[in-house]
């Protein structure tokens, strides 16, 4: 009897060993640990999308991957994000391409004042542009997704209904948004976001131009009672992975990450748009702000004044041997397509 029990136990062990040998090694091994660097503070939308992507990858790989996230520049800063990922200081990094306009010429074309209606449309357009042209500046990394912030709009202590209202108006702005405001006749003033509330209170600036979640997040609605919608520029972002690290991943893990590219671009844009909507509703309910929408004729006048900015960019890009007009054409086509949904 004891001999038969021993034989049955041995047989069960052999079966277990055989079944175990059939399991993929990736499911038996310890989780693959990856580091993900980000530069803005944890509550901001680039970090919110980072945490969402982390959870999706960990869930869809069945625990094969464990991702440690580093917001707020704790691992890599904004200006050295791309080079830091290439060097392997972080496995994954999120960068704002607008901070290096000359380096990311193709994808930064989405920062031109083409009139994106929201972040979802802009994010999907950016992703389409990248996938079509596969710019050489990303040859040393694996691009996981791209997305944008919401379009910049004007909020001020005085109403802006026409170009005449905008003329000479001091507004806090930076980068491409500042260039657009200058073209429209305003006076852009560069300053950190943290200094803007005091500058508004003291009258150093009469308002600002940025995406409208700041009305609630920075409480600008307490001071600026007028919002003018003109669908200004967006800032493009990219999430990239060290190429050696990417090549070391199991094929099934690569497939999960690659499959999230378009979904993550849409999710981030949609999250941003919902946050903007919430901010605007909060501002209307709690601070009675007025939303000013330009009429077709007035909007056409604004668009006419920013056209030279687009033409200047085309000239610069063509000088670098890039098919600049094709980029702008494709951006407009993609914008119109994604705006239908």
Regions found by a protein language model. Give the residues of each.
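N-terminal secretory signal peptides that target proteins for export/translocation
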Residues: 1-7
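Bacterial N-terminal signal peptides
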Residues: 10-24
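Bacterial Sec-dependent signal peptides at the C-terminal "C-region" and cleavage site
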Residues: 25-29
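N-terminal secretory/targeting leader peptides
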Residues: 30-120, 136-341
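A gly/proline- and charged-residue-enriched helix-loop-helix capping module
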Residues: 117-133
